[in-house]
Amino acid sequence: MSTIRTVGLVAKYQEPKAAEMVRWLVPWLKQRGKRVLVENGVVRTAAISCTKKEMAAKADLIVSLGGDGTLLNIAPLVERPDVPILGVNLGGLGFITEVAADELESVLTKTLEGDYETEKRMTLEIRVQSKNGKVHRFRVLNDAVIAKGARSRIIDLETYIGDDLLCTYRADGLIISTPTGSTAYSL
């Protein structure tokens, strides 16, 4: 575990409780000598405002305030495996955002002291090549859904693992999931 010097805060924009927590967290973290990064547009604070991508590159810890969607949005941008993401559930879906809002101060105190455990999660790198040859790349923690367009009834798919062809088929879509995302489809 590396020393936590810079903490990034991402939050669900529409959630007033998230903005309130950011306003509380910025001075709380600064009092503990931490550099604080806040996602652009979340709330005006004394923290450094940046994009999620910049935050993912610079933070030693990311605190995600919202629900699973907020965490799933930042996770693929974090490319360094030593950067923990602390998911704080503010009342929505929270299967992977395990910390309740009223537990945040005590959990974050322990985390900053190095008293925490991480759980490694698999991510997928998805590459989609359209008929015109354009390639789109995505990293996902949960799942990727490839669906037919509004005009199509069915699409032709070639599925590869790395450079090896797995299968070809016609379908209305494809869902590729990590172990984290697979549980969502059983609900």
Residue ranges and their predicted role:
Residues 173-178:
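AMP-binding/adenylate-forming core of the ANL superfamily
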Residues 18, 69-74, 183-187:
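Short glycine/serine/threonine-rich phosphate/pyrophosphate-binding segments
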Residues 59-62, 68-69, 78:
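Feature detects long, helix-prone N-terminal segments enriched in hydrophobes
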Residues 39, 65, 86-88:
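Generic beta-sheet signal
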Residues 21-23, 75-78, 98-100, 187:
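Short amphipathic alpha-helical segments
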